[in-house]
Amino acid sequence: MVNFLKTKADFDQALKDAGDKLVVIDFTASWCGPCQRIAPKYVEMAKEFPDVIFYKVDVDENDETAEAEKIQAMPTFKFYKSGKALSDYVQGANEAGLREKIKKNK
């Protein structure tokens, strides 16, 4: 299961709690077609990579986090380690690209 981070405080706490594990966050929106298409694949990846932590942020419900992370398009998948954003990210419903970046950064 992939949980939603509903507030900026939830986001900050999730990164802190993850320690040095890779965290992947799907910045998504309920009205975004490509977001809905990749959502089941994202859940599959959470099962495929049990050593990686997966979350979602709805950009409309948690706009404070979306703004702080400079999200311009959905879906955007950002990667974090030790509480810091990595330079890698994936924009768009690119399953192969997302899987590749997870393997590279975990």
Curated annotation (Swiss-Prot):
SUPFAM superfamilies assigned to the protein according to its UniProt record, in alphabetical order: Thioredoxin-like
Q: Write out the annotated subcellular location.
A: Cytoplasm
User: What's in the keyword line of the UniProt record?
Assistant: Cytoplasm, Disulfide bond, Electron transport, Redox-active center, Transport
Q: Where is this site: Deprotonates C-terminal active site Cys?
A: 26
> What GO CC terms are in its UniProt record?
cytoplasm
Superkingdom is: Eukaryota
Q: Where is this site: Contributes to redox potential value?
A: 33-34
Provide a Gene Ontology MF annotation, just one: protein-disulfide reductase activity
All copies of the Thioredoxin domain together span 2-106
A Pfam family that this protein carries is: Thioredoxin
- Active site at 32 (nucleophile), 35 (nucleophile)
List the cysteine pairs that form cystine.
32-35
List the Gene3D superfamilies hit by this protein, alphabetically.
Glutaredoxin
Q: Which family does it belong to?
A: Belongs to the thioredoxin family.
Its biological function? Participates in various redox reactions through the reversible oxidation of its active center dithiol to a disulfide and catalyzes dithiol-disulfide exchange reactions.
Under which name does UniProt file this protein?
Thioredoxin
**Which species is this record about?**
Geodia cydonium
Q: What is the lineage of its organism?
A: Eukaryota, Metazoa, Porifera, Demospongiae, Heteroscleromorpha
